[in-house]
């Protein structure tokens, strides 16, 4: 909502702009053309603007200030025109004139209708005292006075016995009134009309805009191998190579800063090779380098020995579960149980902690070349290759079967208008119907289609002034105002009913990496993983023997998995790792229960103005108007200004069938016809112009779940929410995806240029060097940020029994849980140590029994515990620490395929696959409206890992392409850890001699190197083309299966595969345990201002303004003449009046008056707004909805209480109940008085509305009180004087079905102010009962149950006092 100051500023700006425009035209001169001939008389003009209101009726009560009235007519319009005007059409609307002086008093109007009753006047002055009248008869007993002050507290009574358990409370009251819902769905489609005569085919429409991209199709069948592409053009020559062959690889020097390039020197003579320089100091640890290309497969490692399998012990006998005993000594490890039945698919397991790098194995001897393996699974999808040459067009596909009916599309463009139908036969005359009610004046019909332009007529005389137009339809709702400041959090509502299980949420963004967990036990050797980035240099191993370099063999198939090794002992806790990259956001957690209301925080700053909201929905379509008679076509007048849109008219009667008309112009496009058969794909149409954004249609029916959308942009950081409940400890997450490739490091400084040595001949490839020395371990990085809880892992092997945790605090009583699915058969764990006895928790309500799980194998009998006192069922304790490793169980059956892991980082580009078969043409999409150009989206996240595709055939090697331009230098990377020294590569062929580089600075003299043997100088050869891949060798004999080898080095990560189809929705997880209550959150910010109140009645119309002369005067506008008449200068009277009116309306919103039109929320709000007011009856509206359900209450400003009276306030006196049976409590409203409990209605408000207001009243208060007076005759109400006990005391029923009694639990006992019903005297007495509580949900009283009634001489009646909330 615009602020008061904003509104005023905007209005003043608009007035200033208009004045500036008028003044800017002062100096312009208008050229006069020759006067035209006078034309024929024009048609009747369009309806004029709304006329002025009639004279006022008799004065009603003053209402709140309304908005400004309609503008007055522009003054002196006729006089502003002369014969030299440009045209006779109406000029633009004049500025609003200043408010004129009051007009002369009009003639008295006719007698008005009786106005509504005015509000009660102020009380008159007290009249003089009258003469004393005669003494009247004695009056009836007066109403009871206000309750006296409470007496002094009596002596403390004996503690009564523990009361019986109370009944469960009633369900909570309804929640807050919801905000107004969206417009309902469109109604059902009407019956189809009779088929019209087939019109001539319309002109073909323009090509529609391309439809939205369809959902991704299923993978097509494997395509045929395409023909090899043509050889590429020969690339241009490469740049000049470096001088001479590469020398031996020295150790890396420290990276220098890049120097500025020097001037190009002349080519110098080739110098002799200088001595090798000394090794530089050790460089800092660099970042992991970019993934290199896939190397040749390594030699297979030697197979490890299979460990011996331990013998399984006999299963123990299942002991009966004993009561919790004292904490015993840990028992011995039980024997492994028998193999369990195959379990259900577990959830993805937690991320294992990264194991330490193993020592590098010795290279094995080269094995014989194996036979070619069977075709492997299709590799992961590589990045998109370059576009291939266009293939020949495929044959047209078979026609697809019709798809399932789609959701209703958006309204299409209107079709071509058909020719008019032939005139139908006249129907029989209908029976005359009864006279209908007088209809309201019909609204002008919609503007008809524009006729053909007539020949221009002569300019006619000015037409008569048209009739006064009807008021226009209410405008569409304006744009949604900017969001106000954040409001204070409301009181905690009652929990609503449990909603249906929602659809699984989208995968969230990648969350932050969690803290490094404690180092887990080393897992069993896994299969060969993908090659990771180079790890830090390991500890220097002993020098291995150098094996002979074997010939590179074909990549062998992965060997069978080795048997699972025994679980190792838990390692020491590792150092904290460096901060990881932010991981994807975890899935959205379930909504926590709302926290309690916090204290009010400081008011935040006013937020910046939000963008305009989308246009509101279209209003309801009006009814069609009456068809008017066809008039004779007059000559075309000049185009008038568009009039205001009239209201829709009453539907006309059915006309006679007309003659077939001439063929009309091409009409507006019609609605979409029924869905046709899919046509062939049309040629793409030209891009349409960006259309205006259409108005939002009504919400359609919910569509089926769409395909997974791309991740949205990361939103701005929202305000910190209140602290949630502490979740249970999450299971360890799955291993994180491989990080993205790091940025390229900065180029090192140029090294010292040595003198150029003679070009040596290319030497043979040297053997691999020994591994370098291990680097020292780096310092631990700072602790990482706390990660989001990982996804639930797959079910791990049963762990050993953990140490018993400390007893948990008693949790609150849990709600009744949903019936859980049948659990898996768990593996047999070790007998746990007996935990300490926890304090008894509240007993939760019993949930429905789950299906019995399959019997687990018997566990080992635990030690006999001491018999503990049986405690109430406690909630689950906190999760214990991880116990010692259990004995390895027998190998289970292989589980089903697990859920796909998170997507890996983008791998190196794969080879270009063969093109797939052309798909069949899809159905033509419906025309979409052209959208506005959106901003470029951010890079999407990597897609899900797809299923492995079929391998494509290897394409022929293309010729080398031209070298690309140099890319820009990337930003400087952080210093990475020093990588291991790679094996020496083979010496490449020497390049051509390059030009002589600039002289470097003088290097430090190195130690003298040993003289090398001088080789013969060879000629530098040209770089040869890549050879074709050789054919696979002949398959050898299938060798015996070797023992499983040790884990080889991780292979390179393959490219990401195509996205697989979305998996099925997972099952609903088990409900989590109820967490402990969170800390009370801080009080929220003040809420936004409420919606504006209804506008007041329009003010009287302004008097005729001075107006401006907008006709041409020959030289300049009349408004720009010297300002002799001050009345022509527009003042901002109207602006001031509007601003005052707005100010008053805002003022009434902020300070409620306690009237029916402007009620307060509670009496406390009234007292704060008007501290000078006195107690009395005022109107309040606790639910703050429409003021029609406001209630009239008594406000006690001395205490700030809001008091609501019962209706009726008393139950009449009589012998209500006759019974000779045993005495018992009988409810007055429920049993005796035919089910009518006490009611608290207010005039003009229904009982349901009153119940809602009472519910809000209870939520807004934190204290309530009420009293009730029991009038008795021979009936005990509280204490029986004969026996001295309270067994005959009445019972009261509170609002939440709680029973308030005379003795027992102090929270549910009432107090007695006066007890006059303690003995039977055959006379009337009374007992006044009062109940005060800080739980307002227990009041007001709804019923009373006396015990001592039923005799012929026993009577009673009840006065119900008001219930007061504070």
Swiss-Prot record:
Residues 28-1130 are annotated as: Disordered. Changing residue 457 to L: In OI2; requires 2 nucleotide substitutions. InterPro entries: Collagen, Collagen_superfamily, Fib_collagen_C. The modification Allysine is found at residue 84. It holds the Pfam family COLFI. Keywords: Calcium, Chromosomal rearrangement, Collagen, Disease variant, Disulfide bond, Dwarfism, Ehlers-Danlos syndrome, Extracellular matrix, Glycoprotein, Hydroxylation, Metal-binding, Osteogenesis imperfecta, Pyrrolidone carboxylic acid, Repeat, Secreted, Signal. Changing residue 1119 to T: Found in a patient with mild osteogenesis imperfecta and increased bone mineral density; results in defective type I procollagen processing; incorporation of the immature procollagen into the matrix leads to increased bone matrix mineralization and altered collagen fibril structure. Residues 95-140, 225-254, 269-293, 300-321, 330-345, 398-410, 419-434, 470-489, 513-531, 594-611, 623-648, 663-710, 717-737, 752-765, 786-795, 849-876, 884-932, 956-974, 983-1001 have a biased composition (Low complexity). One of its GO terms (biological process) is regulation of blood pressure. Residues 1-22 form the signal peptide. One of its GO terms (cellular component) is endoplasmic reticulum lumen. Trimers of one alpha 2(I) and two alpha 1(I) chains. Interacts (via C-terminus) with TMEM131 (via PapD-L domain); the interaction is direct and is involved in assembly and TRAPPIII ER-to-Golgi transport complex-dependent secretion of collagen. This is Collagen alpha-2(I) chain. It comes from Homo sapiens. The lineage of its organism: Eukaryota, Metazoa, Chordata, Craniata, Vertebrata.
């Amino acid at each position: 909502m615009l602020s008061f100051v904003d509104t005023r500023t905007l209005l003043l700006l608009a007035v200033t702009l208009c004045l500036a425009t008028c003044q800017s035209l002062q100096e312009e001169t208008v050229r006069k053309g020759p006067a035209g001939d006078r034309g024929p008389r024009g048609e009747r003009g369009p309806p004029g603007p709304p006329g002025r209101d009639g004279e006022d009726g008799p004065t009603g009560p003053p209402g709140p200030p309304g908005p400004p009235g309609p503008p007055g007519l522009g003054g002196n319009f006729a006089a502003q025109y002369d014969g030299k005007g440009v045209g006779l059409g109406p000029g633009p609307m004049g500025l609003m004139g200043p408010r004129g002086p009051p007009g002369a008093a009009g003639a008295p109007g006719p007698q008005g209708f009786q106005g509504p009753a005015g509000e009660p006047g102020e009380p008159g002055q007290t009249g003089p005292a009258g003469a004393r009248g005669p003494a009247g008869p004695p009056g009836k007993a007066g109403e009871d006075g206000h309750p006296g002050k409470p007496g002094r507290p009596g002596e403390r009574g004996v503690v009564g016995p523990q009361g019986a358990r109370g009944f469960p409370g009633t369900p909570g009251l309804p929640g807050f009134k919801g905000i107004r819902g969206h417009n309902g769905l469109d109604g059902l489609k009407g019956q189809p009309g009779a088929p019209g005569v087939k019109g001539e085919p319309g002109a073909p429409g323009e090509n529609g805009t391309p439809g939205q991209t369809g959902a991704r199709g299923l993978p097509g069948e494997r395509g045929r191998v395409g023909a090899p592409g043509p050889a590429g053009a020969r690339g241009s020559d490469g740049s000049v190579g470096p001088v001479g062959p590469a020398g031996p690889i020295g150790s890396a020097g420290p990276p220098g800063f890049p120097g500025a390039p020097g001037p190009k020197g002349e080519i110098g003579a080739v110098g002799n090779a200088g001595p090798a320089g000394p090794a530089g100091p050790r460089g800092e640890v660099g970042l992991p380098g970019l993934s290199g290309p896939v190397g040749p497969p390594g030699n297979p490692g030697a197979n490890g020995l299979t460990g011996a399998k331990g013998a399984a012990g006999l299963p123990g006998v299942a002991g009966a579960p004993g009561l919790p005993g004292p904490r015993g000594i840990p028992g011995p490890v039980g024997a492994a149980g028998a193999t369990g039945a195959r379990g259900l698919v577990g959830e993805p397991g937690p991320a294992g902690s990264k194991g330490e790098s193993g020592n590098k194995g010795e290279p094995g001897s080269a094995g014989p070349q194996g036979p070619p393996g069977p075709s492997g699974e299709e590799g992961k999808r590589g990045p998109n290759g370059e576009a291939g040459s266009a293939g020949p067009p495929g044959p047209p596909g078979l026609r697809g079967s019709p798809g399932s009916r789609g959701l209703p599309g958006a309204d299409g463009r209107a079709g071509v208008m058909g020719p008019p139908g032939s005139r139908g036969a006249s129907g029989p005359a209908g029976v005359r119907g009864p006279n209908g009610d007088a209809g309201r004046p019909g609204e002008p019909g919609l503007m008809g289609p524009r006729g053909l332009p007539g020949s221009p007529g002569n300019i006619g005389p000015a037409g008569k002034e048209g009739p006064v137009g009807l008021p226009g339809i209410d405008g569409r709702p304006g744009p949604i105002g900017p969001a106000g400041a954040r409001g204070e959090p409301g009181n905690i509502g009652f929990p609503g009913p449990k909603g249906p299980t929602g659809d699984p949420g989208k995968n969230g963004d990648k969350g932050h990496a969690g803290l490094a967990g404690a180092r887990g036990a080393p897992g069993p050797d896994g299969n060969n993983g993908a090659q990771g980035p180079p790890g830090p240099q390991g500890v220097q191993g002993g020098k291995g023997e150098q094996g002979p370099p074997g010939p590179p063999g074909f990549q062998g198939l992965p060997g069978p998995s080795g048997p699972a090794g025994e679980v190792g002992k838990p390692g020491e806790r590792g150092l904290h790792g460096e901060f990881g990259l932010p991981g994807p956001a975890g899935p959205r957690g379930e909504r926590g229960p709302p926290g309690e209301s916090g204290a009010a925080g400081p008011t935040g700053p006013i937020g910046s103005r939000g963008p305009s909201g989308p246009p509101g929905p279209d209003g309801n379509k009006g009814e069609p108007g009456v068809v008017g008679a066809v008039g004779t076509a007059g000559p075309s007048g000049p185009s008038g200004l568009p009039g205001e849109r009239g209201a829709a008219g009453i539907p006309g009667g059915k006309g006679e069938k007309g003659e077939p008309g001439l063929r009309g112009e091409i009409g507006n496009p019609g609605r979409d016809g029924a869905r046709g058969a899919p046509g062939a794909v049309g040629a793409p149409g030209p891009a349409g112009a960006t259309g205006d954004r259409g108005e939002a249609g009504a919400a359609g029916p919910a569509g089926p779940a769409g395909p997974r959308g791309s991740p949205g942009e990361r939103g701005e950081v929202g305000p910190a929410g209140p602290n949630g409940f502490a979740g249970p400890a999450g299971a360890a997450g799955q291993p994180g995806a491989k990080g993205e490739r790091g940025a390229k490091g900065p180029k090192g400084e140029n090294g010292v240029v040595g003198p150029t040595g003679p070009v040596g001949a290319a030497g043979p490839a040297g053997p691999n060097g020994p591994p370098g020395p291990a680097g020292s371990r780096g310092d631990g990085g700072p602790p990482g940020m706390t990660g989001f809880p990982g996804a639930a892992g797959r079910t791990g092997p049963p762990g050993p029994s953990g140490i018993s945790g400390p007893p948990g605090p008693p949790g609150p009583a849990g709600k009744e849980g949903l019936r859980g699915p049948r659990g898996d058969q768990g593996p047999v764990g070790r007998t746990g140590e007996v935990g300490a006895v926890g304090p008894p928790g509240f007993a939760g309500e019993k949930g429905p029994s789950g299906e019995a799980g399959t019997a687990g194998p018997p566990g080992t009998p635990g030690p006999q515990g001491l018999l503990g006192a049986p405690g109430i069922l406690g909630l689950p304790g906190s999760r214990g620490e991880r116990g010692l490793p259990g004995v390895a169980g027998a190998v289970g059956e292989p589980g089903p395929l697990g859920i796909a892991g998170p997507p890996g980082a983008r791998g190196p580009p794969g080879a270009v696959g063969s093109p797939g078969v052309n798909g069949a043409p899809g159905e033509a999409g419906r025309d979409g409206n052209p959208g506005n150009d959106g901003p470029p989206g951010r890079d999407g996240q990597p897609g899900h890992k797809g299923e492995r595709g079929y391998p494509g055939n290897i394409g022929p090697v293309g010729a080398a392409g031209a070298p690309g331009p140099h890319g820009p230098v990337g930003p400087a990377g952080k210093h990475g850890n020093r990588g291991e020294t790679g094996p020496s590569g083979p010496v490449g062929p020497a390049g051509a001699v390059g030009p002589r580089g600039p002289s470097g600075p003088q290097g430090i003299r190195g130690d003298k190197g040993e003289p090398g043997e001088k080789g013969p100088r060879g000629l530098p050869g040209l770089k040869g083309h890549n050879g074709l891949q050789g054919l696979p060798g002949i398959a050898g004999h299938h060798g015996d299966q070797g023992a499983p080898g040790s884990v080889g080095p991780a292979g390179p990560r393959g490219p990401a595969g195509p996205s697989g189809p979305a998996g099925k929705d997972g099952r609903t997880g088990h409900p989590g345990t109820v967490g402990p209550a969170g800390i009370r959150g801080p009080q929220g910010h003040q809420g936004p201002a409420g919606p504006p109140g209804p506008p007041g009645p329009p003010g009287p119309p302004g008097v005729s303004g001075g107006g401006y002369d907008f006709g041409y005067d020959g030289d300049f506008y009349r408004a720009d003449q010297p300002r002799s008449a001050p009345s022509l200068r527009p003042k901002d009277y109207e602006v001031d009046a509007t601003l005052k009116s707005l100010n008053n309306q805002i003022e009434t919103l902020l300070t409620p008056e306690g009237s029916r039109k402007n009620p307060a929320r509670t009496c406390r709000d009234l007292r704060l707004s008007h501290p000078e007011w006195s107690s009395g009856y005022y109107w309040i509206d606790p639910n703050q909805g429409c003021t029609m359900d406001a209630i009239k209450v008594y406000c006690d400003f001395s205490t700030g209480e809001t008091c609501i009276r019962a209706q009726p306030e008393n139950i009449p006196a009589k012998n209500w109940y006759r019974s000779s049976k045993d005495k018992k409590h009988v409810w007055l409203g429920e049993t005796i008085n035919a089910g009518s409990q006490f009611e608290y209605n207010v005039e003009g408000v229904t009982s349901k509305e009153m119940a809602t207001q009472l519910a809000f009243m209870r939520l807004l208060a934190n204290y309530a009180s009420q009293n009730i007076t029991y009038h008795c005759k021979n009936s005990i109400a509280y204490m029986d004087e004969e026996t001295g006990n309270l067994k005959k005391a009445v019972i009261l029923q509170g609002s939440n079905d709680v029973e308030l009694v005379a003795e027992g639990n102090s929270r549910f006992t009432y107090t007695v102010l006066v007890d006059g019903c303690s003995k039977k005297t055959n006379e009337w007495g009374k007992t006044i009962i009062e109940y005060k509580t800080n739980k307002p949900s227990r009041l007001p009283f709804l019923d009373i149950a006396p015990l001592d009634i039923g005799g012929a001489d026993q009577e009673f009646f009840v006065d119900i006092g008001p219930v007061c909330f504070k």
